[in-house]
């Protein structure tokens, strides 16, 4: 592998139901054994307010090939949620110099089938061009949120992204005027 670490070998903090670190494990082992870890979800919008939507590549370790309305990923061992949000947004969007994503809320994702992670949701405005990683993104576009809503019943989306999106919509409703949106 030319000295490069695969995503399955990345070291993650393993956390408990209160998001306290209780150990570390390789990413591949964390997924295989259903170990709770940390992830970030970044709601990326352009200056017109359109949402960055993309289709994941078929080679992704988790949820290969569906669409997602967030960029993001796992939080590395010892990494903060805030640092991971910026790193993942810049990596997946292929855009450097982004403003630091704004933290919105955090929730525990659990699909009931062994996939569980603490999920921090952020928002970032993307003013410049994007050039997503071809290893991560098979297709992308900025869609008006109304179009995204229409695609929810047509396209297959990642389940954790759908969960984060439902919570984002509820959070915006609870936050009132001036909230994200």
Curated annotation (Swiss-Prot):
Q: Which cofactor does it need?
A: Mg(2+)
Which Pfam families is this protein grouped with?
NUDIX (PF00293)
* EC number(s) stated in the UniProt entry for this protein: 3.6.-.-
**Is the Thylakoid keyword given for this protein?**
no
The answer on whether this UniProt entry bears the keyword Magnesium reads yes
- Per the annotation, the residue ranges of the short sequence motif Nudix box are 72-94
Q: Which UniProt keywords apply?
A: Hydrolase, Magnesium, Metal-binding
Check the UniProt entry and state the signal peptide residues, or none: none
InterPro entries attached here?
A: NUDIX_hydrolase-like_dom_sf (IPR015797), NUDIX_hydrolase_CS (IPR020084), NUDIX_hydrolase_dom (IPR000086), NUDIX_hydrolase_YfcD_pred (IPR024195)
Lineage top rank: taxon: Bacteria
Task: Cite the Nudix hydrolase domain residue spans from the record.
Answer: 35-175
Q: Which GO terms describe its molecular function?
A: hydrolase activity, acting on acid anhydrides; metal ion binding
The protein depicted here goes by the name Uncharacterized Nudix hydrolase SCO1686
Any idea which positions bind Mg(2+)? 88, 92
Q: Which family does it belong to?
A: Belongs to the Nudix hydrolase family.
